[in-house]
Amino acid sequence: MSESWIVVGMAAVLGFFVGSINPATIIARTRHADLRQGSGNPGATNVGRVLGLRWGVVVGLLDVLKGFVPTFLALLLFDRLTAYVVGLATVLGHVLSPFLRGRGGKGVATSLGAILAVFPWFALGMLVVFGLLLWRTRWVAGSSLAAAGLLALYAGLAPLPDPVAAGRVWGICIALLVTIRHHGNIRAWAQRRLN
């Protein structure tokens, strides 16, 4: 194994560790709140339900930073491919946090942070689309899934910086991961439509 791949591997492990630190559960504990209430998800939306909007926004911003900082540092210190690996590892750490026995958050805000580091203009556009949909529908999960779909389209069709193939795979993987983490929301929506 070449030295460069060892560095990439170590950076990915560090990214996974940073991603696995869950601000939602830390803040909930300091506020003596139980995140098993609400949706039960250890993420910003549920913190907003349990502790109020202010704390939900704080957790959301911390999750965005958690995705942005490791990915941006990897881009700054190494290269775009390393940034993709670290960004994906950070999101995986968030959704599969060993500190939460593999039951982490849904990865939306952390993914946004990672995307902001490598595709900043697209990330801002995606955030606008998410915000408009949320304003119209008041449905966080649906707005998140629409943003994930937009990311998959962008990754698949847009002209990306080199390495192009890695960027396409990365974007589609992030979009799929967020979609899979929303399987319960998709199932609940489908049942409501059928009834």
Where are these regions (language model features)?
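Loop-to-transmembrane alpha-helix initiation sites
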Residues: 122-126, 140-148, 162-174
